[in-house]
Amino acid sequence: MEEVESIHKPVMLKEVIHYLNLSPGKIVVDATLGLGGHSSEILRELRGEGLLIGIDRDEEVLKLARERLSKIAGNFVLFNTTYDNLQNILKELNLSFIDAILFDLGFSSFHIEKSGRGFSFMRPEEPLDMRYSKDTALTAADILNTFSESELSNLFWEYGEEPLSKKLAKKIVERRKDKKFAYVGDLLEVIDEVIPRRRRHEATKVFQALRIAVNDELNIFKRALEQVPFILSIGGRIVVITYHSLEDRIVKNFFKSYSDKILPVSKKVIKPSIEEIKENRRARSAKLRVGERRENS
């Protein structure tokens, strides 16, 4: 368990706990449970009262989180599903409302360092999988080997905002005629041909685009957000941590669309401290937004 805690440092933990406005007896959802970094502290704040509901689509991660949370006194229940099933989960628990919900988007350090599923361009030997759940139909390799040139180009532009998306898509289609994509290294060979080495870090955008497409991340997130105003109790809080502009745009649009029900608690986006960024590189691109369920107007 010490290894799990060393792998995963929860981003903006102090800010999350503060803005969730926790107290004993509340019902709290961690929609992106991961390895339970945030949830561990949430459970402590509930002090044996109330309920923590944790959701994660990755069965392997959920198992590790369960082990971690079981060492803390408190009530929790975990669900191995996508977080757009919020209303169904509450129905199963005979609950109508919750008091707080957290979304910490993206993927965890575990997925990069321990999953062996090809989430990072730093692991050329890993298979091009990128699925959070084995129930997901398509792998990253499937997409690279079957999508048309225009579909690939649109994917890299829409989900990765990659300026060389057309050139990259063309090269991928050419390459797969001779050799199918199977490993991270196969994709890196093409990226090296298309994206200048001074922009090597830009491979991140390509991997981001594939990960989002494989797991349908943005659509699932939108569907989940649309349920929040109807399950959050009056005065309840929603806290969202995003890591790139596509996610953040969805959150901003959500607050705008539901301004009659959700009131931003902070007008400005909240960012991690310089100290945290030094200690945890994953926090460097994090943006936290928080809203509160208002009285029905």
UniProtKB/Swiss-Prot annotation:
Source domain of life: Bacteria
Catalytic reaction list: cytidine(1402) in 16S rRNA + S-adenosyl-L-methionine = N(4)-methylcytidine(1402) in 16S rRNA + S-adenosyl-L-homocysteine + H(+)
Biological-process GO terms, alphabetical: rRNA base methylation
EC numbers, comma separated: 2.1.1.199
Molecular-function GO terms, alphabetical: rRNA (cytosine-N4-)-methyltransferase activity
Leader sequence residues: none
Localisation: Cytoplasm
Keyword RNA-binding in annotation: no
Major place of residence: cytoplasm
Principal EC category: transferase
Keywords for the protein's UniProt record, in alphabetical order: Cytoplasm, Methyltransferase, rRNA processing, S-adenosyl-L-methionine, Transferase
Residues that hold S-adenosyl-L-methionine according to the record: G36, G37, H38, D56, L90, D104, H111
KW Phosphoprotein (keyword) present: no
InterPro entries xrefs: RsmH, SAM-dep_MeTrfase_MraW_recog, SAM-dependent_MTases_sf
Any one annotated GO CC term: cytoplasm
NCBIfam families attached to this UniProt entry: 16S rRNA (cytosine(1402)-N(4))-methyltransferase RsmH
Task performed by this protein: Specifically methylates the N4 position of cytidine in position 1402 (C1402) of 16S rRNA.
Family that this chain belongs to: Belongs to the methyltransferase superfamily. RsmH family.
Protein's name according to its UniProt entry: Ribosomal RNA small subunit methyltransferase H
Organism, scientific name: Dictyoglomus thermophilum (strain ATCC 35947 / DSM 3960 / H-6-12)
